[in-house]
Amino acid sequence: MSNEQEKQDYVVDKKGIGEVKIASDVVAVIAGLAANEVDGVDSMAGNITNELIGMLGMKNLSKGVKVVMEEGTVRVDIAINVIYGYSIPKITKQVQEKVRQQIENMTGLIVPEVNVRVAGVNTAD
């Protein structure tokens, strides 16, 4: 998902002595890290490119995350794998809240929408 998104910079501050921009990849990494903090999330789900990157031992912290800037706000689409036995509605709600909270707190950007797709269920190891 992350590789599909167009690289964008979000302007968060035009006041003062210069402009502050945040890259879309930074927002995607924040979203991925926040989602992984939720109990019951096993891993992020990605496309085939992300899977190959993982097999090569490279770490892709924005795997399974797509970030889109629309009218001064940020929309996040995120794909996760959950652990068998956990409540999917509860996990997805917590992911939505955690992702929105972390992006807004760390960047000052407004996040009106966090879409979560459960791509798989894995057993706990």
Stretches with model-predicted labels:
Residues 72, 76-93:
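A short interface-forming secondary-structure element
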Residues 21, 30, 66, 75-81, ...:
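Soluble periplasmic/extracytoplasmic beta-strand elements of cell-envelope proteins
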Residues 38-44, 60-61, 106-110:
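Short secondary-structure junctions
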Residues 113-125:
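Short, highly charged C-terminal tails/helix-capping segments
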Residues 44, 52-79, 121-123:
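Short edge beta-strands and adjacent turn/loop segments
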Residues 1-37, 42-45, 51-53:
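Terminal low-complexity, intrinsically disordered regions
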Residues 88-107:
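Short, non-transmembrane amphipathic alpha-helical segments
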Residues 81, 102-104, 121:
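Extended, positively charged loop/linker patches that create polyanion-binding surfaces
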